[in-house]
Amino acid sequence: MFVLVLYPYVYLLARSAFSNQSSITLEASRSLGCTPWQGFLKVALPMARPAIVAGLSLALMETLNDYGTVEFFAVPTFTIGIFRTWLGQGERAAAMQLAVLLLSFIALLVILERQSRTRQRYYQTNQTTESKRYQLQSWHQWAAIGICGLPIILGFAIPVSVLAVLIKGDRSTTNTSPIGDGDYGTATSGEFLANVPDPFWGYAIHSFTLATTAAPIAVIIAIILAYGQRLQPSKLNRWAIQSATLGYAIPGAVIAIGAMVPLGKFDNALDSWMRSQFNISTGLLLSGTIFALVFAYLVRFLAVGYGAVESSLNNIKPNLDNASRSLGLNTTQTLFQIHLPLMRGGLISAAILVFVDVMKELPVTLIMRPLNYDTLAVRVFNLASDERLAEAAVPALAIIAVGLLPVLVLSWQMGTSIVKRQH
């Protein structure tokens, strides 16, 4: 299950690394007597190792963060233990102890991974030529197509088909809508949307509100961090950026507990002071509103937005900065008049990635959501936990549809970069 869902993390980064490798390096290995397979193992694979390790790290972090899948299949994990201790037993101290233990394990993995790459550097020539394509013959062509298509079939086509069958089957057997009173068992796409009941749109609006709030804030913070590092590339700035983007390596349940405890104490202290001074109750001003959710989302997904923003900013040559200063522009004017227009594609990608991650985030939302503020992800989880799979199919398909956005954007960017290299 996790392999089919998380393999794109490794695939996308590895594909980019292999595509950017110069064919001159591989040709040099061939001139030294290496076969194509030996050249791949001894030259291409080591050069792509940082990207592959980064993809594996992302997949590992996502596995540790997962709650819905392991809960549905009844697999006892650390995240499950944190949820049951916090929400089921009300033991905050024990839940925080489990969170600290899990966080220590993650920190150890990060340290070991960085130590394994100590003093290892991989460079390649800037002289790039288009690699020669190997033309597969006879049955090898169909075997390659089958192997490449297998993850798509197992990880996308079959699950989507099953969800569609569940919707159709539930309508034909119960003559009711899978998520309410709408009649769309045999409806067209327009009739389907028109007959989707209000509760579904409420969950969709909640998800959309949280995502559209967190995404632009994350992009703005990422711009500030990346531009600050560009202007003052000091160790302090680098340390601040590493600290700010560490949240993606931390499971959502741990982030939720780490944010909920101080925000809750602040709310209690503020409420007590307001009661004593003005006889007014402020209630859960921060921890009981979407402010806490958005804050946790920013901690969790800032690294996603920062990566895209930093990559776009690094593609802008420093000569443009010098030219703008020679024309009398200050750093702020340079950012808004030169950098941001050139970074538009990267900014859009960053916003979309954060938007989709927030839409499908479950652990943080389950713990920190305000009362009666369920999202599509929470709705799917609750229905699936009750074995009401047909009712969970429509919101699940909605999340899948939103999740296709970054896939389309990244595919377009990869195609554009390949065309540019060929010209």
Question: Where does each model-flagged region fall?
Answer:
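N-terminal signal-anchor/first transmembrane alpha helix
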Residues: 103-110, 133-162, 237-244, 250
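Transmembrane alpha-helix signature in integral membrane proteins
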Residues: 102-116, 197-231, 239
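Transmembrane alpha-helices
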Residues: 3-22, 34-65, 146-154, 246, ...
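A structural signal for multi-pass alpha-helical bundles of membrane permease subunits
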Residues: 5, 13-16, 23, 54-64, ...
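Cytoplasmic-entry segments and transmembrane alpha-helices of multi-pass inner-membrane transporters
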Residues: 26, 40, 138-147, 224-263, ...
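C-terminal transmembrane helix and the adjacent membrane-cytosol boundary/short C-terminal tail
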Residues: 8, 12-26, 30, 37-39, ...
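Interhelical loop and adjacent transmembrane-helix boundary motif
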Residues: 67-107, 137-141, 167-198, 359, ...
